[in-house]
Amino acid sequence: VDHAAVTAPTAITGLKYNGKAQKLAAPGETLEGKIMYKVNDGEWKEEVPIAVNAGTYTVYYKAVRGEGHGETEEQHFDVNVSQKEIGIEWTNTEVIYDGTEKLPTAAAKGLAEGDTCNITVTGGQTEAGTYTAQAAAIDNANYKLPAETTVTFVIRKADFELTGMPQAKTDLVYDGKEQELITAGSAKSESEDR
């Protein structure tokens, strides 16, 4: 194959994951034969290579005349498909204290159709107060967290309403045994109303 008769394929730059197959190269041309491509350790093919997932791909190419009439030396270039940045939707950022650990919930926004992406949130707290939680990791390698990964959340003190006043017991007579001196009162927390 005459090298002068070959226009080499070129890497497509600026690719970002979108859930669809994207071409990794602008096709090359040859006046004699055809251009063959392979990606990483894949098979040689005539079709311009495509990829769906984020990552770095090594595209190899060569011009082949066919019928054993020669081919150019294989060349290669790298093409990067970058991760898509997700948005984060926070919920449960204001809760009532109940003695259990509280943590906001983070949901990924801006995903390609059919994709899922779970977010691991850290910074859970138990006591009433104001805290910061962080989206620490995601489980889909086609995406990346945004620059801002924290949220402020509040655990409010439970408000109690006295629903029954303790009362002193009257007419107690000594009988040598332990006796209750009052009737127990009762209280209801605001969280029980919800």
What feature does the model see in each segment?
Residues V1-R194:
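Solvent-exposed beta-strand/loop surfaces, strongest in extracytoplasmic domains of secreted
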